[in-house]
Amino acid sequence: MMTYQEIFNEIKNKAYFKNHRHVLIAVSGGVDSMNLLHFLYLFQDKLKIRIGIAHVNHKQRSESDSEEAYLKCWAKKHDIPIYVSNFEGIFSEKAARDWRYAFFKSIMLKNNYSALVTAHHSDDQAETILMRLIRGSRLRHLSGIKSVQPFANGQLIRPFLTFSKKDLPEIFHFEDSSNRELSFLRNRVRNNYLPLLKQENPRFIQGLNQLALENSLLFQAFKELTNHITTTDLTEFNEQSKSIQYFLLQDYLEGFPDLDLKKSQFTQLLQIIQIAKQGYYYLKKDYYIFIDKFSFKITKIVPKTELVKEEKMLEYDSNLCYRDYYFSFMPKSNEDQGQVNIPLFSLSSIKLRSRQSGDYISFGHFSKKIRRLFIDEKFTIAERQNAIVGEQDGEIIFVLVGDKTYLRKACKHDIMLAKLYIDKLEKG
C-alpha cells in the first residue's frame, strides 16, 4: 500500500495536468474513485488544477440513493461542484457505460472542463486485456487502456493506470454488491478467471500489462514506418505486401470506430480494395466504400434525397451559375480557350440537372446511355456525380463531365439559332 504522497511523487513527472486547469472526476463511490477524489483534492494546488465531481446514479441497487446523497454532502462540505445524472432505460453494461460517458462529455462541454479523470488502475487494464482475448479481439485491440486519450473537448486521463489496486490506500467507500454478480463478464474475469490464472503464475497480471505495452509499441512502430504511405491511394496501397496492406487497412479503419467490421467483413473489404473495381460497395451501419481509378475512401451513405441534385431552368438570353459553372448566351469579350460553346437549334428553356437512370445522348447514327459513356471513358465516380446534363425540349443536348463536353449530334436540316457559353468558375 502506498501513501498519496508516494503516488504523487511517481506521477508528477508525467505532467498529466500540465495543460489543464479545470478537471472533472468520475466518481462512483467505490474504493478506486474515492481514492482518486481524495488524491486530487489533496494535491490540486500542487497540480495547479481545480476539480469537479461527476456521478451517475444507475438506480440498480437500494444503496444507490444514499451513495448519491453522501457524495453531494461531501462535495458541499469541501466546496466542490458536483454533477449528478440518473440512468434511464434498459440496463446493461454497455448501456450504462454509454450513458456515463455521454453525461461526462456534456458536463465538460457545458462547464468548461478540459479533462475527465477516471480511476482505472493496472488490475482494470489486465481485466480488459483478458476480456478482449476471451472475446477474440484483434491484435491491435490488445493494447489495452491508454493513460491519456482525446475525449470530448479535451482529454480523458487515467493517472492510476500504472498502479495496482493493492497500491491504493484504505479509504471510506461504498461496496457495490453488483460487482459480485457473475452474470457480467468483467465480474467473472475479476472474481473467477484471474484468481485461477494467478495461481498458475503469480505475475499473470503484470504479464498481461506487459503484453499490452509491447503491443502498443508494436503498432506505434508500424505507424512510424508506414507514415509515408497514403493508404487510400490505390497505387501506393497495392505496391505493398499483403501483410502490410492488412495492417494499413486496419489502421485506416480506426478512423471509423462505429463501423466495427467483423473479421470476415474485413477480409471481404480488403479483397474489394485489392481488386480495385470502381464503384460503391455497401459495408454496414450506413457506411460504404467508394472506389475510383485512383483511390478509395469510406464514408457514410448519403440518403437518396440528398443525392438528387438541384435542377435549374435556364431561359434564353439570361444567365446563371450552376454548381461550378457560369452559363450565358453572350461570349466573353476576350477569346477564352477555356470557354465551352454549345450550338442551339431551339430557343426553348434548358434544364440543367444531374444524370438520371435511363439517360442517353444521340451521336447521330447511334445513341449511347450516359451511364455507359461514363464507364467507357473511365470517369471517376466523383466526376460522374458532378456531371451536368443539359436537356432541351425533352432531349439531352450536352453532357459536361470532368474536363470534357459531349454534344448531341445535330440533324441534317437543323438551323443554329444561338450559342450557349459555359465558363468554369474560379474558386476563391
UniProtKB/Swiss-Prot annotation:
GO terms for molecular function: ATP binding; tRNA(Ile)-lysidine synthase activity. The keyword Coiled coil does not apply. Belongs to the tRNA(Ile)-lysidine synthase family. Ligates lysine onto the cytidine present at position 34 of the AUA codon-specific tRNA(Ile) that contains the anticodon CAU, in an ATP-dependent manner. Cytidine is converted to lysidine, thus changing the amino acid specificity of the tRNA from methionine to isoleucine. Its main location: cytoplasm. PANTHER family: TRNA(ILE)-LYSIDINE SYNTHASE-RELATED. ATP binds at S28, G29, G30, V31, D32, S33. This is tRNA(Ile)-lysidine synthase. It is found in: Cytoplasm. It comes from Streptococcus pyogenes serotype M6 (strain ATCC BAA-946 / MGAS10394).
